[in-house]
Amino acid sequence: GGIYTDEHANLNITKTIDNKDGEIEASKSIELTAKTLANDGSVKTKGDLTVHLQDGLVLNNAFQAGGSLDFKTQGNLTNNSQLRVGNKLSVQAANIENTKEAEISGNETHINTNTLTNRGLIDGALTVAKAVTINNLGTGRIYGDHLALQGDTLNNLEEDNKSAVIAARERLDIGVDRVLNRNESTLLSMGKIYVGKTLDEDNQAAGKSTYVHNHNGVIEALNIYDDAKSKAITFNTGVVENKHFFLETENVDTSSTSVFEYRIGNDSTIYGKDSGVYKVKQDNKSS
């Protein structure tokens, strides 16, 4: 079935909206409030979209909003879709999983959750992700012109031989107490990187974190926007541990040179070919 309007649509449902193979479309805006959204179907507007739920949601068919999207659920969100909006995208849930082929992106992208697990793409001109734990794994990519992360723990880790990437096109702020970047995973900024304990009101790193552990990973700030080339990376942390655990060494014969050396009799002295002349005088005795 379908619900259509050229104006604003306001759906306030106390229990469940079952939108299997259904369409909810409004030209100007949609406000959808319910306990449960089952079988997400198509929810589409040229304007702003608000979706507030009590129960969790597995999103297989992306919401479509030409303006902003404000999504909140008291449960968990698993995103399997290409969730892109034209303006501001705000996503809040108990826990959020953005799967391998999925995307969460807007002009501004704001994420608020307990545990964020990303194996897909999160992007925005401004990207701000706040969570207790941020897990960016394997195929996971978190991008932003200005990218700001806040949490107790950030794990930027390899998975299934893929290395995760967190990258800012201009500025990267990491306001996270404990950071682990591992096995060729990358923390990158085309501009500068700032590391602290939390984010301030301008989404810039503030305070002193406990540690940054870079284990076989890459942390790089290209600093291309600063003509003066001032400090590219600022760590305000107790410990920076930068280790390569899998360094292998071997002896390689790159060249060889012939050397002539000699010694006389039982003499312990070793002479080179240019050491001079050694004369031996031996008395012949007969019995």
What are these regions (language model features)?
Residues G1-S287:
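Binding/recognition "hotspot" determinant
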